[in-house]
Amino acid sequence: MSEEDKAKKLENLLKLLQLNNDDTSKFTQEQKKAMKDHKFWRTQPVKDFDEKVVEEGPIDKPKTPEDISDKPLPLLSSFEWCSIDVDNKKQLEDVFVLLNENYVEDRDAGFRFNYTKEFFNWALKSPGWKKDWHIGVRVKETQKLVAFISAIPVTLGVRGKQVPSVEINFLCVHKQLRSKRLTPVLIKEITRRVNKCDIWHALYTAGIVLPAPVSTCRYTHRPLNWKKLYEVDFTGLPDGHTEEDMIAENALPAKTKTAGLRKLKKEDIDQVFELFKRYQSRFELIQIFTKEEFEHNFIGEESLPLDKQVIFSYVVEQPDGKITDFFSFYSLPFTILNNTKYKDLGIGYLYYYATDADFQFKDRFDPKATKALKTRLCELIYDACILAKNANMDVFNALTSQDNTLFLDDLKFGPGDGFLNFYLFNYRAKPITGGLNPDNSNDIKRRSNVGVVML
C-alpha cells in the first residue's frame, strides 16, 4: 500500500475517532455558513455566530409541558416513529446495524465501530433514563430502522449555574435517506419529548460547525501498539524513521508506577465522589453528577470479562486510607474488515479524572499549582496508558478539555485532524476555553474550562 493510501487510511480512522457522522477539518470561515444559510438552526433557540452574550441564560421564553403538543411530529407516509427498547436484543441489534453502516461516511476504510450491549447499557441507561428518549424511525413496510437519536438526563453546571438538561447523542440517519431531511425532524421530536418532561435545555457535540459553539476541543491520539496500527495501515512510517524507531518511541512498560494505584471499588464511592466534585468545580462547563449517576458511570458491570468491559476506573489510595487521585477511561473498539491477521482494533478514550495535587493553592493557575498538577497528571495518565494497553487497547484518545493540555505533549499524544464543537440548546453562554491556542495548538497556559466529557 502506498504512503498516500496509508495517509487516507489514517484520515478515515481519525473520522471514526470523532464519534460523529460528519466530516470535519480545521475550524475555518468557510465552514461557518451565515446563520441565514442554516435553514433549520435559524428556527431554533441557539446562539448566533456573531452574537455578543451580555447575560447568560435561557434563550426561549419560559414554557410549561402543557404548552407542548402531545402528538409526535408528522413523518412521510412511508415512515413511522418507534421507541427503541435497549433491553430488547432484536431492537438493539437494529441500532447496531444502523450505526455500524451509517454513523461514518466513508465505508472504504475497512473498519467499523464494534458496538455492544454492554456499551449501550452503560451509555444509554444512566439513572433516570427513559425508553421514550431512545427514538427511532422505521420504514413501515419492512420495519427497517433508518434513523436514531438518543437523550439521557443530566444536570449541567454552566459557570456555577445548575441547568437541568439532556445530553443528545448517537444521531444517525441512513445514508440513502439524508435528502429526506430526517435530521431536523429527529431533533424536533426529541425536543418535544424532553420538553414534555419539563426539561428545556440540551448539550450536544458535532465535528461540523453549527450556530454556535460554546467551546471547541481537539482530539489527540496516543499510540499504544504502534506496530499493529502500522500493519493494518492506520498509520504511516514518518520520514527518517524505521519501524523499530517508532516501536521504541511509543513503548510502554508492562507495570504501572504509582504507589497505591488500584481499581475503584463501590466502598470508595463516597470518598471519590467528594474528590471528584471538588476537582470538577474549577471548570465552567460540567456535568453535575448525583452519587447514583457517579456510581453508574464509573463502577460499571463488575462481573464482565475483560473483553466486554466498557468502563475502567482507578484510584490512588494512600497508606492512611485517603484517596488522593482518580482516573477513568472507556473502551469502544473497532472491527477491522478484510484483514487476515487482525479482527479488532482496541480504542481507549480518556474519561474523567480528579486529583488533590493542587488543592493547597487558591489559584489553579499559580505556577506552583500548575507544576504540582502537571507532575501528578503526567504520572496518572501515563499509568492510564499502561493499563489501557494491558486491556488490549491499541490507541488511547483524549481531547484538549479539562486539564489535559498539561500532559498531552509529554505523554506523546499527537494532535488529530478532528475537532469537537460543544453546543448548548436554548441556553446563551459566553465562550468557554477548549484548550486550544488560535493556531489550534495545545493551550498549556489557559488550558480548558470544559469539564464535561461526551461519549
From Swiss-Prot:
It comes from the Eukaryota. Changing residue 451 to D: In NMT1-181; temperature-sensitive with myristic acid auxotrophy. Reduces affinity for myristoyl-CoA. Transmembrane segments: none annotated. The keyword Amino-acid biosynthesis does not apply. It holds the Pfam family NMT_C. InterPro entries: Acyl_CoA_acyltransferase (IPR016181), NMT (IPR000903), NMT_C (IPR022677), NMT_CS (IPR022678), NMT_N (IPR022676). Changing residue 99 to P: In NMT1-72; temperature-sensitive mutant with myristic acid auxotrophy. Monomer. The keyword Transmembrane does not apply. Adds a myristoyl group to the N-terminal glycine residue of certain cellular proteins. Substrate specificity requires an N-terminal glycine in the nascent polypeptide substrates. Uncharged amino acids are preferred at position 2 while neutral residues are favored at positions 3 and 4. Ser is present at position 5 in almost all known N-myristoyl proteins and Lys is commonly encountered at postion 6. It is found in: Cytoplasm. Signal peptide: none annotated. It catalyses: N-terminal glycyl-[protein] + tetradecanoyl-CoA = N-tetradecanoylglycyl-[protein] + CoA + H(+). Residues 168-204 are annotated as: Myristoyl CoA-binding. Optimum pH is 7.5-8.0. Changing residue 169 to L: Reduces the chemical transformation rate. The N-terminus is blocked. GO terms for biological process: protein localization to membrane. Changing residue 217 to R: Reduces affinity for substrate, but not for myristoyl-CoA. Belongs to the NMT family. Changing residue 170 to A: Reduces the chemical transformation rate. This is Glycylpeptide N-tetradecanoyltransferase. Its main location: cytoplasm. The active site is at 455 (proton acceptor).
